[in-house]
Amino acid sequence: MRSTAVLALLLCAGQVFALPVNSPMTKGDTKVMKCVLEVISDSLSKPSPMPVSPECLETLQGDERILSILRHQNLLKELQDLALQGAKERAQQPLKQQQPPKQQQQQQQQQQQEQQHSSFEDELSEVFENQSPDAKHRDAAAEVPSRDTMEKRKDSDKGQQDGFEATTEGPRPQAFPEPNQESPMMGDSESPGEDTATNTQSPTSLPSQEHVDPQATGDSERGLSAQQQARKAKQEEKEEEEEEEAVAREKAGPEEVPTAASSSHFHAGYKAIQKDDGQSDSQAVDGDGKTEASEALPSEGKGELEHSQQEEDGEEAMVGTPQGLFPQGGKGRELEHKQEEEEEEEERLSREWEDKRWSRMDQLAKELTAEKRLEGEDDPDRSMKLSFRTRAYGFRDPGPQLRRGWRPSSREDSVEARSDFEEKKEEEGSANRRAEDQELESLSAIEAELEKVAHQLQALRRG
């Protein structure tokens, strides 16, 4: 029994120690907790929330902990607001940086509008001033010097036209009539019309003419610059062709070994070409005709060179003509078109002349190859070789004359002479064959070089 009583006492004592002590702090906390529960329950009571009792409101408002919590929440809200404001400001900064160019553009537009308004106002003021009698007197005074300047321009244009006619009246070849001679006549025929037009125009149209003249002069300068470029290109092409011809001649010159017979056949080939052009047949046989034929071809080349030089001089004279000679607007374009057509005709004529020249050179090369295959080197017995060559080519046969002068006295002498003659023929034949082989090789090389040069020239023409 005692043990049970002791255990019961111990349990009661433990319970007593475990119970909390009611202090004033704990009482205030319990009130606050009850009020908080009441507020939560009232706020959650739906659909009709209950109002909080005034005692709970007083306790909650008087508790510093709740006030600090509420203040902390307010601080958080304020911090959130500040963060949002900072983000907005950061987002607005690049927009602000982009705004100044727009503002500048707006300012520029405003300035332009102001300038336009000011210019419009100036024009209006000028119009009103021009309508006044003083302005009319001023215009009349300004028109007098403008007329003087126009007359001076006309005099200078006439002097330049006279100089241009003097330059263009030089000797020109009649083989190729040039249409370039029409340009000064056109300028002369059209310039009086322009002079009369300028005289008949009213003074009010003079400013408009002064405004149009720079455009016409610019068009004429462009046309002249294009003509100069085309002329330079032509001159460069001619120089290149002349250099190629000189190189081909230098290559072909040392390899050819002209002999008396080859030179005679060479001149005969030139004469045959000149026969086609209308020359007499007697020049192909006589020795004097050979020299005449050899001099005729260089003279033709000189005439053609002089013709080309005169054409270039005429074109330079056209370039040097004053701008006042060319009519303005569509007339200037027509003249440019005519000049282009004339240049095309000149190019075509030059191409035809070059084709003829190369065809002649090809014919001469073929004749030389055919001749040198049958020719041989010089031998001590010149008369025998000449007789052999004349028989091979079918010219006048001096064989009977040699036989008449060479008459053997006896049969033995004739037999010995025949044997010597046959031996000489064999020796000459072997020597001729060797020489012919060498010449054939050299001629084949020359022909190959000529073909290469011809192909290059054709490629240059096409290009």
Curated annotation (Swiss-Prot):
Residue positions where Methionine sulfoxide is found in the record: M384
GO biological process: defense response to Gram-negative bacterium; defense response to Gram-positive bacterium; mast cell activation; mast cell chemotaxis; mast cell degranulation; negative regulation of catecholamine secretion; positive regulation of cardiac muscle contraction; positive regulation of dense core granule biogenesis
Compositional bias (Low complexity): 92-116
Modified residues (Pyrrolidone carboxylic acid): Q438
Annotated glycan sites: S430
Region feature (Disordered): 88-440
Protein's recorded name: Chromogranin-A
Known partners and oligomeric status: Self-interacts; self-assembly is promoted in vitro by chondroitin sulfate attachment which occurs at mildly acidic pH conditions. Interacts with SCG3; this interaction is optimal in conditions mimicking the lumenal milieu of the trans-Golgi network, i.e. pH 5.5 and 10 mM Ca(+2). Interacts with ITPR1 in the secretory granules.
Superkingdom per UniProt: Eukaryota
Protein family (similarity comment): Belongs to the chromogranin/secretogranin protein family.
InterPro entries for the chain: Chromogranin_AB, Chromogranin_CS, Granin
